[in-house]
């Protein structure tokens, strides 16, 4: 109980205290006109009410991570609560807020443009390709689970394949139409459904507080096969959007083009991430409470079935048929609304690169059709493999974004430590994961075996972490020396 409420207090208090601190560093200017007015085009640059901007941003970023990722993440024990709270306030919310404001200050530029502006043209091109691949992956990954959930609620004649096609038809409309026509009108409904689900699950959770794991129980791993699921780095990749996600930085420019005033940035970008962290916290606790605090039962269920049926079962058992339906609607809406804006972002990134105007439907179709085809083809790959690669790509993108913001703050002679520390940490997470994860380079089967043969007193985890810390330090040093010194030199020349 206490671990849950302490984490909740950190999230809420962090928004008001640390969020305000970050806001001061960013030099917010309320008198400066935003891109919604200076770049208005009736399609992507449109001033929207703040409540709509918040709900759209929240739905854009709240994909599978804060629900499915949080449920898988709680298998690592109370450490998941700790990471969701601290990771959100000092990592994810700062990442989303700073990247959103950099985009806003650069006329609503897409993420590759923002990164390239700080780290150079070479990395801009890398980021364009990287972000485009991630957006297409999101479009594919965030279709399968919603389609399965809807298929389970409808007649057998409307199978999963039917709903996959239906969702893709919706994606096409959401990608092509002006943002205020479909997304601006539909998202608030989905947003309220998602918030209703979170509040409903939270209220029921209050009657099962004794089953929520405590920090005093120990922060050790609860996975039965913990050696193949080490807390570091696996937990930080699994929880993903529930604490920090590079995908969010690709979505923030969409709302940077619709926000009416710079002062609203903290409410929209930082606030939406904090709400997502609260959502992740609720679902992590709910999964444990549903199985009466038994990690073994939760692990067994996830092994036999998956997270989607569990979400359905918790919702209908706790909230009844009507409440369960609204809850499932929110769960379905979260990934679908992330998928559609991901493909919209892919269109905008491609159009920015080609300098291809998007003022007519035909011109938008020219860019969109190849993107949709690629996303549909990728869906034919096994979902578990897709999800793991998505998870790593997602967090790797946050590394690029955090380093870009760090360089920006250094150039402005601001307190860049607020993004430097998260950048260093996430660099180590992503490096460690890709170096010895089964879907990565699996260096633990190569280098570490050789080292242990020479030094038998060392174990495989010590070797792996030492290698990865070394690589992370090397990567960080390269960023610091090449980019940090370069931009400071440029700043001196301008002075």
Give the ranges of each region predicted by the language model.
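Helix-loop-helix module between adjacent transmembrane segments
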Residues: 10, 91-107, 111-176, 240-244, ...
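Flexible loop linkers connecting adjacent transmembrane helices
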Residues: 20-46, 70-72, 78, 94-123, ...
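Hydrophobic, membrane-embedded alpha-helices of multi-pass small-molecule transporters
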Residues: 48-65, 202-210, 219-283, 329-338
């Amino acid at each position: 109980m206490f671990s849950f409420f302490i984490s909740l207090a950190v999230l809420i208090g962090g928004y008001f205290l640390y969020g305000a601190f970050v806001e001061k560093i960013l030099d917010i200017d309320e008198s400066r006109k935003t891109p919604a007015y200076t770049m208005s085009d009736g399609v992507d640059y449109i001033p929207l009410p703040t409540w709509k901007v918040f709900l759209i941003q929240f739905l854009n970023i709240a994909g599978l991570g804060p629900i499915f990722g949080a449920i898988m993440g709680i298998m690592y024990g109370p450490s998941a609560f700790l990471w969701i709270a601290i990771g959100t306030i000092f990592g994810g919310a700062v990442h989303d807020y700073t990247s959103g404001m950099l985009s806003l200050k650069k006329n609503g530029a897409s993420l590759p443009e923002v990164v390239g502006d700080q780290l150079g043209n070479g990395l801009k091109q890398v980021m364009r390709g990287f972000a485009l691949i991630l957006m297409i992956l999101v479009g594919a990954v965030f279709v399968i689970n919603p389609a399965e959930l809807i298929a389970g609620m409808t007649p057998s004649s409307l199978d999963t394949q039917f709903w996959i096609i239906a969702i893709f038809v919706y994606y096409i409309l959401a990608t092509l139409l002006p943002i205020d026509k479909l997304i601006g009108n539909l998202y608030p409904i989905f947003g309220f459904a998602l918030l209703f689900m979170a509040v409903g699950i939270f209220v029921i959770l209050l009657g099962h507080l004794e089953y929520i794991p405590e920090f005093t129980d120990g922060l050790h791993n609860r996975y039965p096969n913990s050696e193949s699921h080490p807390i570091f780095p696996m937990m930080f990749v699994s929880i993903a959007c529930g604490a920090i996600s590079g995908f969010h930085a690709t979505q923030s420019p969409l709302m940077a083009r619709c926000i009416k005033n710079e002062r609203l940035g903290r409410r929209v970008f930082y606030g939406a991430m904090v709400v997502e962290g609260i959502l992740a916290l609720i679902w992590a606790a709910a999964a444990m409470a549903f199985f009466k605090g038994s990690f073994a039962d939760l692990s067994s269920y996830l092994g036999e079935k998956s997270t989607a049926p569990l979400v359905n079962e918790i919702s209908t058992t706790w909230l009844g048929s009507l409440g369960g339906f609204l809850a499932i609607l929110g769960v379905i809406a979260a990934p679908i609304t992330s998928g559609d804006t991901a493909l919209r972002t892919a269109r905008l990134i491609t159009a920015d690169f080609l300098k291809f105007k998007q003022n007519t439907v035909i011109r938008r179709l020219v860019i969109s059709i190849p993107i949709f085809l690629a996303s549909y083809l990728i869906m034919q790959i096994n979902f578990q493999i897709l999800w793991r690669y998505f998870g790593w790509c997602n967090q790797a993108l946050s590394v690029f974004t955090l380093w870009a913001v760090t360089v920006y703050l250094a150039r402005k002679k601001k307190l860049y430590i607020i993004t430097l520390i998260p950048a260093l940490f996430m660099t180590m997470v992503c490096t460690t994961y890709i170096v010895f994860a089964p879907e990565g380079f699996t260096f633990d089967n190569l280098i570490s075996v050789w080292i242990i043969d020479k030094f038998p007193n060392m174990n495989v985890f010590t070797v792996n972490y030492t290698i990865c810390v070394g690589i992370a330090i090397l990567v960080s040093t390269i960023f610091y020396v090449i980019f940090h010194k370069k931009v400071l030199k440029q700043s001196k020349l301008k002075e």
